[in-house]
């Protein structure tokens, strides 16, 4: 796949196949319900993890959805063509995911009471995860060397554009108590506490026992063994897991946020690159 073959939607680069002009039009005309819950992420920031977490929290620990329904059907992407095929099968409250920046959300979202869980992730981890994903996904551009891929990332010449623009669009959205910001890192460090924050935000009074059950079933080990979640159902012609595993255990990286909370730095060898501008 070459960059020239990516679908350009209002300046946003998207991979063809899963995204079509029709699916994007459907997303813009989508009727958002007040009870809908959106997990919003920049690519490679915990989307699949949230597709595991959301149905378990919304269904108070019932494992049936995550054991019987592929993650892309149980919590579908707003912008992908699959949504049209499964939307009528989604139970209420509906869980959905999207990589859209805020300004790309449908008008019905902005007039609804739908809630958003925005998952933020260390940008260096995003780059590394995305780099490996590009190596295994045949529908994406060849990433080249890691140095070249970092340059593309900083330029926004990657799926869904610049990370900083995505993050700022949601940080600046005036959604009040409709949005919860949570980090991938706090989920890694203490998943039960993160699940408690999510369940409280969604108005679920889950017991400690249910929280532990959800945490156990959303662990790296459990998800890696779950065919409904590890993307092993996707044909090799689209994802070659011999080149890289889709679920890769997070090892942590060198990053920091300045005391002003407005600048992020990315350590690339001895080089520091400012990402927030």
Language model features with spans:
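Hydrophobic alpha-helical segments
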Residues: 201, 217, 272-276
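C-terminal, well-structured subdomains that either form a transmembrane helix-short loop-helix hairpin
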Residues: 183-194, 198
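A generic structural signal for alpha-helix starts
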Residues: 45, 186-189, 205
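Marks the mature luminal ectodomains of secretory-pathway proteins
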Residues: 198-204
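Short, conserved secondary-structure transition motifs
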Residues: 77-78, 218-225
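Short, solvent-exposed polar/charged micro-motifs at secondary-structure junctions
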Residues: 105-107, 190-193, 221-222
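PAPS-dependent sulfotransferase catalytic domain
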Residues: 1-182, 195, 209, 228-277
């Amino acid at each position: 796949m070459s960059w020239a073959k990516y679908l350009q939607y209002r300046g946003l680069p998207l991979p063809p196949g899963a995204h079509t002009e029709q699916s994007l039009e459907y997303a813009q005309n989508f009727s958002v319900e007040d009870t809908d819950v959106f997990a919003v992420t920049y690519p490679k920031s915990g989307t699949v993890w949230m597709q595991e977490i959301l149905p378990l929290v919304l269904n108070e620990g019932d494992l049936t959805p995550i054991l019987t329904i592929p993650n892309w059907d149980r919590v579908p992407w707003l912008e992908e063509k699959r949504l049209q095929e499964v939307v009528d099968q989604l139970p209420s409250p509906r869980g959905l995911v999207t990589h859209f920046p805020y300004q790309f959300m449908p008008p019905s979202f902005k007039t609804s009471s739908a809630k958003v869980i925005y998952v933020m992730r260390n940008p260096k981890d995003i780059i590394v995860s995305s780099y490996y994903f590009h190596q295994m996904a045949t529908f994406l551009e060849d990433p080249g060397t890691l140095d070249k891929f970092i340059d593309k990332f900083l330029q926004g010449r990657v799926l869904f554009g610049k990370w900083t623009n995505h993050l700022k669009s949601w940080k600046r959205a005036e959604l009040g108590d409709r949005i919860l910001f949570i980090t991938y890192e706090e989920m890694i460090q203490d998943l039960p506490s993160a699940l408690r924050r999510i369940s409280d935000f969604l108005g679920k009074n889950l017991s400690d026992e249910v929280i532990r059950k959800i945490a156990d079933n959303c662990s790296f080990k459990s998800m890696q063994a779950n065919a409904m979640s590890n993307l092993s159902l996707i044909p090799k012609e689209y994802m070659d897991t011999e080149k890289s595993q889709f679920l890769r255990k997070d090892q942590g990286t060198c990053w920091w946020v300045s005391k002003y909370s407005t600048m992020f730095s990315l350590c690339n060898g001895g080089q520091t690159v400012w990402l927030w501008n």
